[in-house]
Amino acid sequence: MTFSDELRTAAAGPWAAATTHRLVDEVWAGRVEPGAFGDHLVQEGLVLDLYLALMGAAIAACDLPESRLAHARRAGLVAGPPAGYLARAMDVLDVPLDERTHPEPEPATAELRALLGSVRAAADHPSCLAVLLATDWLRLDSATRPDADPPTDPLLREWLELRRGAAFEGWVAFLRLELDRTSAALDDDRRAALRALFLRTAELDLAFLDGAYR
């Protein structure tokens, strides 16, 4: 079992709860309440900002030029379609301008932002990888249901499409390989710290989804 497999197994509880969360299920069913979805997208925008900052730290902390390029290419993609989607979706959902320009973070959003910010500030490459992997692997699993038809609503369908597909699968596979590689030379204490960080990220991502219904 690889180290990334170990982390995924350790986070099995919050992982299962997040990938079958009410919000995810309702998106797949095409019946999520517009107000709740709009509120969630506002919170996603707050997280996206710190997520991009963390990607910048990962770019700076990379130990291999080819890895730095892979991170940089992905950061450019995240700054494009996902950010554009949030703006368009909030237009369609009539999210008030004040909520977009002066958003108030929910408690779980604030905690997730704090985690992203602290890992960014530390600029430790394996730690950056652990958080990025937990976040995006969880997104991929949430948006992957081989036997399910995607929703017909274009906003909901695009929300899923941004979290899956060959390019996104390749990104998650890259993060797994990088974390497996960079963690191989670490001692048990450092690997345990990465395991705890991965688990904490999964727990906060679950709490972040819960925030849509508070």
Describe the role of every protein-language-model region:
Residues 12-18, 31-61, 127-141, 209:
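Alpha-helical bundle segments that constitute or directly flank the non-heme di-iron/ferroxidase center
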Residues 193-214:
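Acidic, carboxylate-rich catalytic segments that either coordinate divalent cations
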Residues 168-198:
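Long amphipathic all-alpha helical oligomerization modules
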Residues 24-29, 116-118, 181-188:
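Short, charged/polar, low-complexity loop and linker segments
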Residues 55-62, 119-120, 143-150, 182, ...:
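Secondary-structure edge/capping motif, primarily at the C-terminal ends of alpha-helices
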Residues 1-24, 165-177:
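Acidic, low-complexity proline/glycine-rich segments
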Residues 42, 66-170, 199, 203:
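Active-site-proximal alpha-helical scaffolds that flank and shape metal-associated catalytic sites
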